[in-house]
């Protein structure tokens, strides 16, 4: 069997039927890039019908989890991710901020819970945590966990043993996105290798932490590259329990500012492909919702998205306010998990 953290090629595997046992088990490579391209090429209504059918087999079709994301350390990152306003080398207006205190994080988590969120995510802008950062994070994770919330952290590249410390503190999920397909990755990031990301996912799995791993669409990638991203995710063994799909938020000062915007229906197609290929996962409608019409968000839910980030800010970019989200839920007959 291939390693769960080896890169796949287009001809390595063929598509399993989405309703078959082999499509659910994470025991072997299941989805080729060509097979996922075939999904993305389907007539829109056929693709959405297939995704909704799979979604209803494994999830409450009208339930959406509310997650809140906070930046515990903002700005000054040494990486060169072309989409990120927190990279120190870009002039985006994002100022470096001192790491939040434990009390500030707990206060934010408490407010999120009172607003209806059940999941609290903490992100930090650095290449990877030092030991003192891990010690800080274990304190805040334990404190947030004590509130009865599901916890997630996105802290960059992990060294051996760090994931175990986070697990012992009560961390439920670790987020480390692949961002895009390996073939397109070098166009977006040069300061870390694709394999670095896969190695961190291996550390997370080894510590028995749930994996939160997805990507960004609208980076200027081709449809084949979007299929390649979904193939990489779906063929992890097992595939991630949580799959955030982000629509690029263009920030002035980053290299990707001014990139032609992706057709939003292509974003919906990507959500549908994620749902079909990873039927048990939470598919998270993540960054970019503020620029989406309500009708497009509704189509994303129909395509199998069952989580949103809730609150007026995602790290450093805007997000729909909570009242708008609750009003949309009422229109669509959705309820919070």
From Swiss-Prot:
List residues of the Radical SAM core domain: 62-289
Q: Give the record's cofactor note, including how many are bound.
A: Binds 1 [4Fe-4S] cluster. The cluster is coordinated with 3 cysteines and an exchangeable S-adenosyl-L-methionine. Binds 1 [2Fe-2S] cluster. The cluster is coordinated with 3 cysteines and 1 arginine.
Q: Which GO MF terms are attached to this record?
A: 2 iron, 2 sulfur cluster binding; 4 iron, 4 sulfur cluster binding; biotin synthase activity; iron ion binding
InterPro entries to which the protein is assigned, alphabetical: Aldolase_TIM, BATS_dom, Biotin_synth/BioAB, Biotin_synthase, Elp3/MiaA/NifB-like_rSAM, rSAM
Q: Name one GO biological process term.
A: biotin biosynthetic process
The cofactor required is:
[4Fe-4S] cluster; [2Fe-2S] cluster
* Source domain of life: Bacteria
Record EC number? 2.8.1.6
Q: Which family does it belong to?
A: Belongs to the radical SAM superfamily. Biotin synthase family.
Q: What does this protein do?
A: Catalyzes the conversion of dethiobiotin (DTB) to biotin by the insertion of a sulfur atom into dethiobiotin via a radical-based mechanism.
User: What quaternary structure, including any partners, is listed in this protein's UniProt entry?
Assistant: Homodimer.
Protein name (record): Biotin synthase
Which organism encodes this protein? Nitrosomonas europaea (strain ATCC 19718 / CIP 103999 / KCTC 2705 / NBRC 14298)
- The gene from which this protein is expressed is bioB
């Amino acid at each position: 069997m291939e390693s769960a953290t080896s890169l796949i090629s287009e001809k390595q595997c063929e598509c399993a039927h989405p309703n078959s046992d082999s499509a659910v088990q994470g025991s072997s490579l299941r989805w080729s890039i060509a097979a996922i391209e075939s999904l993305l090429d389907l007539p829109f209504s056929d693709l959405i019908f297939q995704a909704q059918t799979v979604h209803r087999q494994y999830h409450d079709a009208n339930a959406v989890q509310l997650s809140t994301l906070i930046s515990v350390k903002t700005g000054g990152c040494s990486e060169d991710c072309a989409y990120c306003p927190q990279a120190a080398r870009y002039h985006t207006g994002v100022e470096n901020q001192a790491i939040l205190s434990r009390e500030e994080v707990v206060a934010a988590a408490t407010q999120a819970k009172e607003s209806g969120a059940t999941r609290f995510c903490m992100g930090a802008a650095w290449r990877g945590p030092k030991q003192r950062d891990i010690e800080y994070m274990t304190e805040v994770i334990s404190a947030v966990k004590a509130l009865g919330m599901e916890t997630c952290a996105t802290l960059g590249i992990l060294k051996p043993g760090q994931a175990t410390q986070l697990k012992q503190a009560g961390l439920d999920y670790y987020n480390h996105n692949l961002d895009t397909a390996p073939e397109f990755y070098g166009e977006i990031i040069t300061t870390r290798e694709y394999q670095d990301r896969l190695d961190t996912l291996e550390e997370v799995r080894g510590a028995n932490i749930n994996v939160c791993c997805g990507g960004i669409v609208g980076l200027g990638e081709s449809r084949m590259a979007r299929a390649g991203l979904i193939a990489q995710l779906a063929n992890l063994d097992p595939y991630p329990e949580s799959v955030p799909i982000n629509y690029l938020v263009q920030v002035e000062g980053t290299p990707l500012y001014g990139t032609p915007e992706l057709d939003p229906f292509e974003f919906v197609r990507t959500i549908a492909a994620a749902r079909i290929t990873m039927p048990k996962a939470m598919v998270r409608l993540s960054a970019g919702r503020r620029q989406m019409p309500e009708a497009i968000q509704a189509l994303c839910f129909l395509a199998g998205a069952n989580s949103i980030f809730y609150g007026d800010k995602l790290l450093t970019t805007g997000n729909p306010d909570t009242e708008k989200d609750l009003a949309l839920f009422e229109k669509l007959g959705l309820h919070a998990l």
